[in-house]
Amino acid sequence: MDLNNRLSEDETLEQAYDIFLELAVDNLDPADVILFNLQFEERGGAELHDPAEDWAEHVDFDLNPDFFAEVLIGLGEADGEPITDVFARVLICREKDHKLCHILWKE
């Protein structure tokens, strides 16, 4: 993989959020979809992190943080606060030529 061909942090967040929006209705409880849509402007956010260690239970490849990121999407207590109600954890490959993502949805 090429370090010079990676998505920026903003591009990674945007791509993960777009994927979340496309798939949320099919994977979240309808009440959670309504809550997220009503509260996102006031309390919503997406946070970029290195992949958590528990992803190893879900995927069978090396999660080098130079090429993979975890994006938490959900609601915080207030605008700008850390996300406390996680609706999705998106594992995404940051290499532009390698489209790959996995999502763990709120249960």
Swiss-Prot record:
InterPro entries: dsDNA_mimic_put, Put_dsDNA_mimic_sf
Organism superkingdom: Bacteria
UniProt similarity note: Belongs to the putative dsDNA mimic protein family.
HAMAP family: Put_dsDNA_mimic
NCBIfam families named in the record: PRK05094.1
Role, per record: May act as a double-stranded DNA (dsDNA) mimic. Probably regulates the activity of a dsDNA-binding protein.
Protein name (record): Putative double-stranded DNA mimic protein ETA_15890
Organism: Erwinia tasmaniensis (strain DSM 17950 / CFBP 7177 / CIP 109463 / NCPPB 4357 / Et1/99)
